[in-house]
């Protein structure tokens, strides 16, 4: 029985780690005891334990000192003490990679491996395989084959697991032991059968047909080991995911049959596999959910936990499938295990009806203070999902969340609550004032700088739009007086937004900013001075450019461009259009599966587009194309099961497109060389250059590029269809060795057509204050037209189609159409290729289809013409 130590014991050192203050040099000095005769097993055991402890704590051993200790340890093989011998095996495995000449123990290990002492044989095999390299493997091959089929289960299991590890060193040699592995797979011992099956799968996993045959054999004949059943289920589910047969396959029938197995672990594995299969319908989930429902009433806490955790996952995608379990889940709310109770309540929050929300919230409040922060975050995530499902219940949720915010808790927990309240404010305009009031109360006593700055940003964004914005000024200015530099700077920015949007508050804000100009911190002073001078001009366009919208460029890209500018001094001022735009974060794509409280990077890191910019810049043909404007999502140009897998990423530059083709050769008997994708445009686009992929070996992806110039004479030609053909030189090769023939021959493969559309020329850019941005751009290049969308039946459908077609960013949450409305205004913003801001205001009216009045404003005439021409 483990003794439980209280805090006093810890402080006095009683019961603390006996190896806590070990010094490597002292332990290595003690290791010299190994050379003494007679050998003292007890003392040697203690020293070996110390060495293993240091190694596992990450202590660095130099090669010389490790080798010296290793050689001294080899003398311990002269002792017949069983415990000492097995400790030697463990130490050999740990020191194999840091000592030199470890092969000197090969003969001792081989002797133990083939000896009569069964207790030595298994550990000796594991240690021997750890020090064996590819050149020595054939020397012990005969012993390994014998050990795999040995009657002693521990020996057979050791040989099988070691063989599995040896496949990384010499796959071809281990593959010759497949007959022995198949013999071991028919063993009566559950662990031997499991390990044998694992080795067989590892040897055959690259051959889909062989895996299917193996699965077919063992699913029909059956296995005795529950562990082996679990492995078969996992292999079957992996094959099901890769195949198109889906739930009509015999593999699915096998997994479903395992729900009736006598072993609980097999039943759970089968249920879990069914639930995680893609595109599973509620009807197909039903048997798995029924089994999990039975587990909910199990006397075993582990089974109850597994069941409710899995049902929680099901509820994220198929809440209706879990509704039948609601009664069982309600019984688990009072479970003595708080983890089970938390998962039960969060599952009920996902599946419950609107009428049950109040009751569930009361039940949560009774025990929420007793659970860990990790589970509190899970509860908050469930509440967030419930808010989206039942927006009218926001007041109940908001009250509950504000109470949780007052409780003690760590940063991740508090951030989850703040994120949840922000999402409620954004989704429910009616909740804005109460939500902002809770946020103001929280920052009065907030110890987390990140959260304080986030809330101040929210107040600056939403506060000025409320009926009485003046009430937030006091809370914001308190932060300037009481907080650290980062929070003070954020408070100054928030104050400026109030002054920019509310004329009545402007004089007061200017006075407060003047006070901030005396701050001790440079950043706070600079911000206050800058905003003070901008606000004094009282120009809406200036406010929009420098207070509301801010910079829309990539921080990493700007840092790099500025650094380059300082390295090459020029009389020309720095041009912001040379900096790549920042891509819009996919906030609306959050799912319940992704935790809300994920760690954010503390410094600017390169995003996907910045990485592409660096990769393309090193290719000589692309050096003078200018800044990378946009990179598209990958477009698949082949079917999933074809000989070659090709997908395309479209990189947009001011006057060119670079098409990046990611190609994978799925044929193991071919080596492809000089791979290019030839493109034939339907319009006036011109192909300038091909950059080939030098070679494509089996299953190793390669990249080739095609450079295309845009038509000079027609800037409105934004749409084009390219016919694509992959051309290459084929060299046949041996599938086993991968060695290609000397001679090759030319071949080609026709790909799907590739489309260019308007959305490829526009980068999404979020404008926090659309009205101010609209005035900032001005009406110099304003175009307007009215269209009839006869095939569109709802405003929601019209909004989604417009956003998708134009590829622009919705602003002011105008992508959400209020219920029971016959008219709506959609605001979109973006930047057209070349760096020109483009704004679209689309007035929609529903009557026998949808009538749409589109107004476009831009800094240049071309984007306005292009957008209207494309919509028409």
From Swiss-Prot:
A Pfam family recorded for this sequence: COP-gamma_platf
Record keywords: Cytoplasm, Cytoplasmic vesicle, ER-Golgi transport, Golgi apparatus, Membrane, Protein transport, Repeat, Transport
Primary localization class, coarse: cytoplasm
Protein name (database record): Coatomer subunit gamma-2
InterPro entries hit by this protein: ARM-like (IPR011989), ARM-type_fold (IPR016024), Clathrin/coatomer_adapt-like_N (IPR002553), Clathrin_app_Ig-like_sf (IPR013041), Coatomer/calthrin_app_sub_C (IPR009028), Coatomer_g_Cpla (IPR032154), Coatomer_gsu (IPR017106), Coatomer_gsu_app_Ig-like_dom (IPR013040)
HEAT repeat locations: 64-101, 283-320, 321-355, 356-392, 395-430, 467-504
Cell compartment(s), UniProt: Cytoplasm; Golgi apparatus membrane; Cytoplasmic vesicle, COPI-coated vesicle membrane
Known function: The coatomer is a cytosolic protein complex that binds to dilysine motifs and reversibly associates with Golgi non-clathrin-coated vesicles, which further mediate biosynthetic protein transport from the ER, via the Golgi up to the trans Golgi network. Coatomer complex is required for budding from Golgi membranes, and is essential for the retrograde Golgi-to-ER transport of dilysine-tagged proteins.
GO molecular function, one term: structural molecule activity
Protein family membership: Belongs to the COPG family.
Membrane-protein topology: Peripheral membrane protein
GO biological process terms on file: endoplasmic reticulum to Golgi vesicle-mediated transport; intra-Golgi vesicle-mediated transport; intracellular protein transport; organelle transport along microtubule; protein secretion
Superkingdom in the source lineage: Eukaryota
A GO cellular component entry from the record: Golgi membrane
Provenance organism: Xenopus laevis (African clawed frog)
Keyword Cytoplasm: yes
Quaternary data: Oligomeric complex.
